[in-house]
Amino acid sequence: MKRSFLFLQGPCTPFFERLAQALKTQGHEIHQVHFCAGDIFYGRGIAASWFNKSASHLSDFLQTVYQRHGITDQILFGDQRPVHQPAVQLAKRLGIRNHVFEEGYFRPRWITLEREGVNNHSLLPHDPQWYWEVGGRLPDDPFTVAFKSSFVDRAVHDVAYHVAGLLNPLLFPRYKNHAGISAPVEYAGYVKRLTHLRFIREREKIRARKIALGKAPFYVLPLQLNTDAQIRHHSQFSDMRELIEYVLVSFAKHAPTDSHIVIKNHPLDIGWMNYQKIIADCEKRFDLAGRVHYLEEGGWAMLGSNARGVVTVNSTAG
């Protein structure tokens, strides 16, 4: 059955462009909405409409696009971007299917594609018991297809997308990035942190190994990014500082007195928060001196396999 697909914003890669071309090859109609110059850069060869008005006009604009092109399906990456939230709701009201991509719930080698929403808006059951029951029936080694995707490749695409965005003030003057920080600030943070990691990487690996192979029982708390959409939109925490305090209060009250906890930074953190200072302050306030260890990097596999437990907040490490 022939369908008409509308593509909204995708990842900062050629993925949506290639998916659109594949659907077109199968005989489906393809259209796209450009919200910024980066969308144009990664939407070459796809018929598109530009949205460069204020957000209050988006629903009317989309409804016109739906009608003009007979849209039956809408494809997007993430359901919490400002331009996606009203689009998802409007499509639902009009009987248009939403197909929402997201970073994989399981990594590597997995991506997530769900109908109508992801994460907290997923149609999957919210009852933990369901996952215990279904998980027990799944194969231990599900079939996966290995693929190569280096950090450098992804970084090049990300930079290209945001370099194109330099034209936004001219072409899309009302566009607001969905990320919590600007690309230049993010890139500067990466450079600073990666430079720092060059000098401490081996030391951190040694520390992680010592903890993992030591006699003291320990737990691991892998941090998430402060800019993570699920933290900002679907959690009780405004940032990782609040999470750290919440977990350490519980650890001080309930964990065995001989146990330790390792707090490991996210590999893509840009260094906005001084976690060492935050954790040191919590150690004093909650009487945890010597039981809390902070790692910038290193040894996740060894730590995870030797830990008594892992405390997660929207982390694939769990």
Placement of each model-derived feature along the sequence:
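Conserved catalytic-core segment of nucleotide-activated headgroup transferases in glycan assembly
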Residues: Q26, F172-Q276
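Active-site-proximal region of nucleotide-activated glycan assembly enzymes
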Residues: H99-H196
